[in-house]
Amino acid sequence: FCKSLPLPLSVK
């Protein structure tokens, strides 16, 4: 996941 979502889960 790219830093596309505001959720920390997406920033893997």
From Swiss-Prot:
Q: Which GO terms describe its biological process?
A: defense response to bacterium
Give the lineage: Bacteria, Bacillati, Bacillota, Bacilli, Bacillales
Q: How does temperature influence activity?
A: Active between 40 and 90 degrees Celsius. Activity is reduced at 90 degrees Celsius and absent at 100 degrees Celsius.
Q: Which UniProt keywords apply?
A: Antibiotic, Antimicrobial
The record lists the organism as: Paenibacillus alvei
Q: What does this protein do?
A: Has bactericidal activity against Gram-positive bacteria L.plantarum ATCC 8014 and B.cereus ATCC 14579 as well as against Gram-negative bacteria E.coli ATCC 25922 and S.enteritidis ATCC 13076.
Protein name as annotated: Antimicrobial protein AN5-2
Source taxon at top rank: Bacteria
Activity's sensitivity to pH is recorded as: Active between pH 2 and 12.
